[in-house]
């Protein structure tokens, strides 16, 4: 069994309801909820928008491999109204965004569609703040996070 850390964000629609729906779907499809951060309201990162984000980080216990989790999170995003992914560093408003941050069984993943640990998680306050709620022992200077 692995511990998986996921970042969730929403800046369109009923943000609370969308994050809650995503959390329910993740618990049904990915694994058992271990802990959930509080929700943080943050400014958009990497683009300008009048719509602030609501962000959280969740830790789940899962038997799934990172690639399987990625496909599930992408399906959840589509089901909750996301129509396009960020591409080439071009970001936009979205009803839901789910990113895999860390996976305890597969701490290092490098593929065209997924990199673990998430390469930008320590540069983004909207990830760092909620991640510190659920895993305060993690530190950006650690070579491989101790999950």
From Swiss-Prot:
Pathway: Cofactor biosynthesis; tetrahydrofolate biosynthesis; 2-amino-4-hydroxy-6-hydroxymethyl-7,8-dihydropteridine diphosphate from 7,8-dihydroneopterin triphosphate: step 4/4. Keywords: ATP-binding, Folate biosynthesis, Kinase, Nucleotide-binding, Transferase. Signal peptide: none annotated. It holds the Pfam family HPPK. It catalyses: 6-hydroxymethyl-7,8-dihydropterin + ATP = (7,8-dihydropterin-6-yl)methyl diphosphate + AMP + H(+). GO terms for biological process: folic acid biosynthetic process; tetrahydrofolate biosynthetic process. Coiled coil: none annotated. InterPro entries: Hppk (IPR000550), Hppk_sf (IPR035907). Catalyzes the transfer of pyrophosphate from adenosine triphosphate (ATP) to 6-hydroxymethyl-7,8-dihydropterin, an enzymatic step in folate biosynthesis pathway. Belongs to the HPPK family. This is 2-amino-4-hydroxy-6-hydroxymethyldihydropteridine pyrophosphokinase. It comes from Porphyromonas gingivalis (strain ATCC BAA-308 / W83).
């Amino acid at each position: 069994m692995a511990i998986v850390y996921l970042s969730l964000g929403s800046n369109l629609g009923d943000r609370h309801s969308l994050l809650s729906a995503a959390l329910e779907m993740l618990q049904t499809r990915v694994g058992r909820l271990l802990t959930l951060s509080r929700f943080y309201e943050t400014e958009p990162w990497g683009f300008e928008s009048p719509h602030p984000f609501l962000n959280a980080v969740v830790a789940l216990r899962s038997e799934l491999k990172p690639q399987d989790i990625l496909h599930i999170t992408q399906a959840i995003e589509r089901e909750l109204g996301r129509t396009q992914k960020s591409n080439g560093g071009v970001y936009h408003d979205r009803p839901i965004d789910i990113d895999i941050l860390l996976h305890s069984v597969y701490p290092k993943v490098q593929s065209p569609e997924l990199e673990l640990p998430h390469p930008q998680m320590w540069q983004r306050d909207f990830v760092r703040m909620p991640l510190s709620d659920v895993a305060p022992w993690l530190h950006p200077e650690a070579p491989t996070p101790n999950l």
